Swiss-Prot record:
Stated family: Belongs to the GreA/GreB family.
UniProt GO BP: DNA-templated transcription elongation; regulation of DNA-templated transcription elongation
Protein name: Transcription elongation factor GreA
GO MF annotations in UniProt: DNA binding; RNA polymerase binding
Domain of life of the organism encoding this protein: Bacteria
Coiled coil: 47-74
Amino acid sequence: MVEKVPMTSGGYAALENELKQRQSVDRPRIIEHIAEARSHGDLSENAEYHAAKEEQSHNEGRIAELEDKLARADVIDVTKLSGETIKFGATVTLIDEDTEKKTVWQIVGEVEADAKKGKISITSPLARALIGKKMGTTVEVMAPGGAKSYEIAKVEWR
């Protein structure tokens, strides 16, 4: 049984763009580097050749990984979701009960999670604590520094 990979339409598009970049730009550039390095003669001691081959291996591995994730993607259009209950795709505004600091997180698939962009994986401890909860509820999450409590201030679908 093939395990589906949940992701937003934005996450799917980002993976598609990376795949196109790697296939149509990076792959030909690397092949060119290999050909150029090969022309320098003895391959056994040709560091440039070995570096280009290693780069090719890395690129081809990532292409295979991207193709696999895209093939197994379960794309969820977040804009068509609604409701007060937090689930995949929700954008949640939290208030730290200790510091009163507001943070906004969107719950996304593992492949598109990026804390710097405010996107957390559905498998993260925070997302798992939020799933199924509603606005106004308080959740407690085990963090590296101990338990943290957050009030759910807002649930949006965007």
